[in-house]
C-alpha cells in the first residue's frame, strides 16, 4: 500500500474537499452484497485472493470507515474521490476535475492498478476496495452534485421532525427508515432483479451511471423541507433502483477487470 499511497499523493495535489459520506453503511453493504451474488467464477476467485475472508459488502464500506484515520491521505488526498461536480446543463469531462481528482478520475486510476499484474498485492487490494465503493457512490444522485449546495449538504430539511440535510436523507435516512438489515434489504432487492435487467444494466459504463444520477438529481429537491412518509414513498423506487444498479454494475465491472479477454463489462459473465 505504501507504493500506491506515495504515487497517488505525488500525482494529486493535496487539498481539502467537500465532505461526503455517499450511501451510508447499509446502502454500501447492500450494493456489495448484490454484487457478490453476480460475480463470475474468475472474479470471485480473485476477490477472495485479495480480500481473504472479507466480502464485497465489507469492502464497500471500507473507504468510509477509513475517514477516521487522521493521516493526510484519508483526510485530504482521498476525500474528493467520493463524488463529482457537474453543473446543471454541463456534461462531465475529466479535464474539469479538481487537481486532487474526483470519483471518476480515481476510478480510472484504481482500475489501472487492479488490472496491473505487477502491482503490489496491497495496492491491488486498496484499488479493489475503492472501486467497489466508488461505483456505489456514483449511483447516489447527490454525489453528482451541481456544485452550488455541496451535494445537498447545505439544503436544510427535517426528516420526521428531526433536523438534518437532504444529502443525509439520501445517504442513509430513507434506507434506515425501512428497519431492515443490509442482508435483508439486499435479499429483497435481489429477488426483484430480472435476468433482462441484469444484462441491460451490465452494458453501461461510468459515464452512463453518472448521467443517470444527474438526471435523478433534478427530481429529488423537495418544495417542502418537512420530509416524512410522502417523500419516502415518492422516492423509494429511485433509491431501490440505484442500489440495485450499483450492485449489478460492481459485479459486471469486476468480472470485466478480472477477465481481460472480455471487451466490455457485459461480456464478462
PLM segments and residue spans:
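N-terminal, motif-rich segments that launch catalysis or mediate targeting to/interaction with membranes
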Residues: 21-134, 141-269
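N-terminal signal peptide c-region/cleavage motif recognized by signal peptidases
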Residues: 17-19
Amino acid at each position: 500500500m505504501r507504493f500506491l499511497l506515495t504515487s497517488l499523493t505525488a500525482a494529486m495535489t493535496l487539498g481539502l474537499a467537500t465532505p461526503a459520506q455517499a450511501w451510508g453503511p447499509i446502502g454500501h453493504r447492500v450494493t456489495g452484497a448484490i454484487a457478490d451474488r453476480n460475480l463470475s467464477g474468475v472474479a470471485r476467485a480473485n476477490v477472495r485472493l485479495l480480500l481473504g475472508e472479507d466480502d464485497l459488502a465489507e469492502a464497500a464500506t471500507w473507504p468510509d470507515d477509513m475517514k477516521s484515520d487522521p493521516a493526510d491521505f484519508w483526510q485530504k488526498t482521498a476525500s474528493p474521490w467520493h463524488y463529482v461536480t457537474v453543473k446543471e446543463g454541463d456534461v462531465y469531462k475529466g479535464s474539469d476535475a479538481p487537481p486532487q481528482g474526483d470519483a471518476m478520475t480515481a476510478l480510472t486510476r484504481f482500475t489501472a492498478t487492479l488490472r496491473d499484474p505487477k502491482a503490489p498485492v496491497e495496492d491491488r487490494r486498496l484499488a479493489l476496495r475503492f472501486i467497489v465503493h466508488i461505483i456505489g457512490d456514483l449511483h447516489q444522485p447527490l454525489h453528482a452534485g451541481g456544485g452550488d449546495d455541496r451535494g445537498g449538504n447545505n439544503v436544510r430539511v427535517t426528516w420526521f421532525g428531526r433536523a438534518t440535510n437532504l444529502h443525509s436523507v439520501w445517504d442513509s435516512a430513507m434506507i434506515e427508515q425501512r428497519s431492515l438489515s443490509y442482508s435483508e434489504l439486499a435479499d429483497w432487492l435481489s429477488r426483484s432483479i430480472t435476468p433482462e435487467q441484469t444484462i441491460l444494466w451490465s452494458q453501461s459504463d461510468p459515464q452512463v451511471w453518472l448521467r443517470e444520477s444527474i438526471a435523478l438529481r433534478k427530481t429529488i429537491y423537495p418544495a417542502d423541507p418537512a420530509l416524512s412518509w410522502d417523500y419516502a414513498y415518492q422516492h423509494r423506487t429511485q433509491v431501490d433502483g440505484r442500489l440495485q444498479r450499483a450492485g449489478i454494475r460492481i459485479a459486471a465491472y469486476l468480472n470485466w477487470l478480472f477477465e481481460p479477454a472480455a471487451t466490455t463489462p457485459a461480456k464478462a459473465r
